[in-house]
Swiss-Prot record:
It comes from the Eukaryota. GO terms for biological process: translation. The keyword Phosphoprotein does not apply. This is Small ribosomal subunit protein uS7c. CDD domains: uS7_Chloroplast (cd14871). Its main location: plastid.
Length: 155
């Protein structure tokens, strides 16, 4: 039996202005080269732009966007008898949120536009409405899992 203790699960901290964990998760994912103040600046500008576009609470739009993009199921490569199968697996809520944030940021980086705050706000508003690149990525993942449903017993 191992003598190592189990690591305590870290709880996500809240951001200083909105006191929201999702905003903090977004900040930590957009972070590049340790420039956290710039990451906060981009996120807060994006939230302001979302407020102007939708004229509703921007945090509810953010929650709705992340809920819309969060996948329930994904595929994982599993090697069985010399061939690799894409095995569908269920995703937990924390991992799903992390994937959703990664997809939203990736989709907003690919968008044409002036700056990251503008692109991110546009992607979040689109995702909340049920369109956009991140939603397409989620649907693609679900289709892939559905197509490989026959391999679910390899789990």
């Amino acid at each position: 039996m191992s003598r190592r203790g189990t690591a305590e699960e870290k709880t996500a901290k809240s951001d200083p202005i909105y006191r929201n964990r999702l905003v903090n998760m977004l900040v930590n994912r957009i972070l590049k080269h340790g420039k956290k103040s710039l990451a906060y600046q981009i996120i807060y500008q994006a939230v302001k732009k979302m407020q102007q576009k939708t004229e509703t609470n921007p945090l509810s739009v953010l929650r709705q966007a992340i809920r819309g993009v969060t996948p329930d199921i994904a595929v994982k490569a599993r090697r069985v008898g010399g061939s690799t199968h894409q095995v569908p697996i269920e995703i937990g809520s924390t991992q799903g949120k992390a994937l959703a944030i990664r997809w939203l940021l990736g989709a907003s980086r690919k968008r044409p536009g002036r700056n990251m705050a503008f692109k991110l706000s546009s992607e979040l508003v689109d995702a909340a409405k049920g369109s956009g690149d991140a939603i397409r990525k989620k649907e693609e993942t679900h289709r892939m899992a559905e197509a490989n449903r026959a391999f679910a017993h390899f789990r």
